[in-house]
């Protein structure tokens, strides 16, 4: 029995695709002329490391009738919808609309999570959760870098990202792995990732009670990972405190070289 237009349109929904996306078409990569389910499948399979430009895709192959054709949401041969979500700018298809895709004009790509839940930060150059609006430290193009833990490019990564207090970014999964290994400072700038006030007050009290004068070894120089100030302090075994901002997030450095 021949399917009506509505049945034909929805035929095979969520039944085709790859590990990255549910879709009823494959794309022809203009860079190498090979066929892949998506750009991620292409990027994972190339031996020379070249990546597919999503905006350059010109033709797709319907997975229902195997017809190659120009990029469009509906197959012109069999009438099947090749992706319930379709972006003509990104040449992007996905049947899983629960992911709440939206296209950000400023980012120039499609994102997931619902347009109302995100805003585009002009300085950081990416979409962030509305919970971070006016509540994050801006770093220019902070998302257009590799994750400092796994080194995957963050801007168009499929994995969720986390914005640290200092403004640097990493994958949320990598952030949790870092905590499991008792790493509590940014791997890029060494600023603490949590509010350390309570811990530092306790450290001050411990130093005051147990380390008075007994372990002074002259003077030395420290650099503060919070305010970046370099100061000279009494050298201790532990607990060097920044004279500028009172932080203990410091490390020993060589004495500065004074001009002749």
Curated annotation (Swiss-Prot):
Signal sequence extent: none
EC number annotated for this UniProt entry: 2.3.2.27
Residues that bind Zn(2+) 5: 104, 107, 120, 127
Induction, per UniProt: Induced by cold, dehydration, salt, hydrogen peroxide and abscisic acid (ABA).
Zn finger (CHY-type) start-end: 11-80
Main location, first listed in the record: nucleus
Gene Ontology CC terms: cytoplasm; nucleus
Residues noted as binding Zn(2+) 3 in the record, renumbered to the chain: 62, 65, 75, 78
Binding positions (Zn(2+) 1): 18, 20, 38, 41
Pfam families to which the protein is assigned, alphabetical: zf-CHY, zf-RING_2, zinc_ribbon_6
Zinc finger (RING-type): 147-190
Expression (tissue specificity): Expressed in roots, leaves, nodes and panicles.
Pathway: Protein modification; protein ubiquitination
InterPro entries: RCHY1_zinc-ribbon, Znf_CHY, Znf_CHY_sf, Znf_CTCHY, Znf_CTCHY_sf, Znf_RING, Znf_RING/FYVE/PHD
Gene3D superfamilies hit by this protein: 2.20.28.10, Zinc/RING finger domain, C3HC4 (zinc finger)
Primary enzyme class: transferase
Reactions catalysed, as given in the entry: S-ubiquitinyl-[E2 ubiquitin-conjugating enzyme]-L-cysteine + [acceptor protein]-L-lysine = [E2 ubiquitin-conjugating enzyme]-L-cysteine + N(6)-ubiquitinyl-[acceptor protein]-L-lysine
Chain sites annotated for binding Zn(2+) 6: 121, 124, 136, 138
Zinc finger intervals, CTCHY-type: 82-146
Function: Possesses E3 ubiquitin-protein ligase activity in vitro. Possesses transactivation activity in yeast cells. May modulate abiotic stress responses by negatively regulating antioxidant enzymes-mediated reactive oxygen species (ROS) removal.
PANTHER family documented for this protein: E3 UBIQUITIN-PROTEIN LIGASE SRFP1 (PTHR21319:SF13), RING FINGER AND CHY ZINC FINGER DOMAIN-CONTAINING PROTEIN 1 (PTHR21319)
Protein name (record): E3 ubiquitin-protein ligase SRFP1
Native organism: Oryza sativa subsp. japonica
Phylogenetic classification of the source organism: Eukaryota, Viridiplantae, Streptophyta, Embryophyta, Tracheophyta
């Amino acid at each position: 029995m021949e399917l009506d237009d509505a049945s034909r349109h929805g035929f095979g929904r969520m039944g085709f695709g790859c590990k990255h996306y549910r879709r009823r078409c494959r794309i022809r990569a203009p860079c190498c002329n090979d066929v892949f389910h998506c750009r991620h499948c292409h990027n994972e399979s190339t031996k020379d490391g070249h990546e597919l430009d999503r905006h350059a895709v010109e033709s797709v192959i319907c997975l229902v009738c195997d017809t190659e054709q120009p990029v469009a949401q509906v197959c012109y041969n069999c009438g099947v919808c090749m992706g319930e979500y379709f972006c003509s700018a990104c040449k992007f298809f996905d049947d899983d609309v629960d992911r709440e895709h939206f296209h950000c004009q400023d980012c120039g790509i499609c994102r997931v999570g619902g347009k109302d839940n995100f805003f585009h930060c002009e300085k950081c150059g990416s979409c962030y959760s509305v919970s971070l609006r006016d509540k994050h430290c801006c770093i220019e193009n902070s998302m257009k870098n590799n994750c400092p833990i796994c080194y995957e490019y963050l801007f168009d990564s499929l994995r969720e990202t986390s914005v640290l207090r200092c403004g640097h970014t990493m994958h949320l999964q990598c952030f949790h792995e870092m905590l499991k290994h008792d790493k509590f400072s940014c791997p890029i700038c060494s600023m603490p990732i949590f509010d350390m006030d309570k811990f530092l007050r306790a450290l001050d009290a411990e130093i005051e009670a147990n380390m008075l004068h007994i372990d002074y070894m002259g003077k030395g120089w420290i650099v503060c990972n919070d305010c970046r100030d370099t100061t000279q302090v009494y050298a201790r075994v532990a607990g060097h405190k920044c004279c500028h901002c009172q932080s203990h997030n410091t490390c020993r450095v060589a004495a500065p070289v004074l001009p002749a």
